[in-house]
From Swiss-Prot:
It comes from Mus musculus. Belongs to the carotenoid/retinoid oxidoreductase family. Its EC number is 1.-.-.-. GO terms for biological process: mitochondrion organization. It is found in: Mitochondrion matrix. This is Pyridine nucleotide-disulfide oxidoreductase domain-containing protein 2. FAD binds at residues 38-71. Interacts with COX5B; this interaction may contribute to localize PYROXD2 to the inner face of the inner mitochondrial membrane. GO terms for molecular function: oxidoreductase activity. The keyword Membrane does not apply. The gene is Pyroxd2. GO terms for cellular component: mitochondrial matrix. InterPro entries: Amino_oxidase (IPR002937), FAD/NAD-bd_sf (IPR036188). Keywords: FAD, Flavoprotein, Mitochondrion, Oxidoreductase. Its main location: mitochondrion.
Amino acid sequence: MAAGGRGLIRALHSSPCPTWKRAQSGANGRLKPEYDAVVIGAGHNGLVAAAYLQRLGVNTAVFERRHVIGGAAVTEEIIPGFKFSRASYLLSLLRPQICTDLELKKHGLKLHLRDPYSFTPMLEEGTLNRLPRSLLLGTDMAANQKEISQFSRKDAQAFPRYEEFMKRLVLAIDPLLDAAPVDTTAFQHGSLLQRLRALSTLKPLLKAGRTLGAQLPQYYEVLTAPISKVLDQRFESEPLKATLATDAVIGAMTSPHTPGSGYVLLHHVMGSLEGTQGAWSYVQGGMGALSDAIASSAATRGASIFTEKTVAKVQVNSEGRAQGVTLQDGEEVRSRVVLSCASPQVTFLELTPQEWLPGAFVKRISQLDTQSPVTKINVAVDRLPNFQAAPNAPGDQPQGHHQCSIHLNCEDTLLLHQAFEDAKGGLPSQKPMIELCIPSSLDPTLAPPGCHVVSLFTQYTPYTLAGGKVWNEQEKNTYADKVFDCIEAYAPGFKRSVLARDILTPPDLERIFRLPGGNIFHGAMSLDQLYFARPVPQHSDYRCPVQGLYLCGSGAHPGGGVMGAAGRNAAHVVFRDLKNM
């Protein structure tokens, strides 16, 4: 679809140069032949790692292959006048101490917290005096109960207990996010000193156990059972269950009936922003503004960040130790350590010389589950969507539900399961699960006056299509048209409001952002690929078989979701190792 219509006659405008960009014109921006540490990839985790290392006095350089930093946490004006969070689009899971330590607000980070945060309209006939029903959830528990009681009074009474139950589990899991997993290798094969040091890695696990106490078996079930089972035990109304279940399958090639889907839900409710547990926000200026703030913090301390500098190979010396990188243009940069924010597959199967990696390790990396159900569609529109269940106010000003994650085709968990079954057969879902967000409802800087940016996070779309088909432009547009038809049923007039769109299928997400298989987490967040086993068993502490080479991206513990924890944790592991060299 060609760009056109109101607001699109504006030429691409240049925003003020971020602090980190200005820093590159200074002394610390010139490429040097040697650094203490080199970071491959300027995704948010790589930037966090660089910022922490630089704070600790480790001279660090970051090399990014694209023209823009942030990895998947990026803002791009791909349609003139419209700024899109092109891949990741919401913030919640970023560790609070990262915001504090790196002084991100000082470096320009501004958040728009959403309250209410979830809106699920029903696809049903209204009457003269009654609109189609909808489920609107926010931080006001009394208001939530009133909304839920439309569907079940019993569920309205049970909902506060469910929220408290999940909150306690989040508090227990929280300490596990901020440290490397238990060092089982040291316990098994380390020296006495190494074993004593490894005892400290048990503390987060012990703390989690104490927090859960006698309820540990119930919480174990939440982590291992299908989310449908967990929700069926507590609720009876499908709109509530399906709305909650979306957090258990988002970004995952799983159904609500898949064992272990409960953990993915937990992963998406464990965030905390500005002291509010479970809060989700839009970032002023898009997700790239978060990456700019982290980069600014790192650059202010002296880190060097380079764009359009692709790392072609990790250099390994004759003793099997990483000693720098070779760039695509042939330039060599030496360093004492190398951190990779790239996925495990790119890091170990493409960049690291294979002769230095054990065959069993390479095999495990190549077998990681990276299935992705996600197609992201970024849309420029010339008016707000007008939902039948919540008609727009006069003047077309954003209302509370417009700032929410708007869940479409999510009235019943059976709809989610059927959408999953379509994709398992190699077909895009006939009724895809759609999470529609309108960040410009809270941040008008993202679009021309009167216009809006719409983010459509949709699933399920398989990476490989049945019948030998490929994701060409025709297939992509056919699927996008299907998504738009679904939205039109809830919000008539949506299709007429569309000015332009950007369609990113799993192969596109892999090609542009190097997300393996298009997986937004760098690999499935299933129980067999978490904690001790992320990315693979025996190598969950950010180290790998090549000494001096570390993994610091979402493929490492604790996983994806614009959390920053992997970058922060890896930086501390690297710093300890540097002190012992």
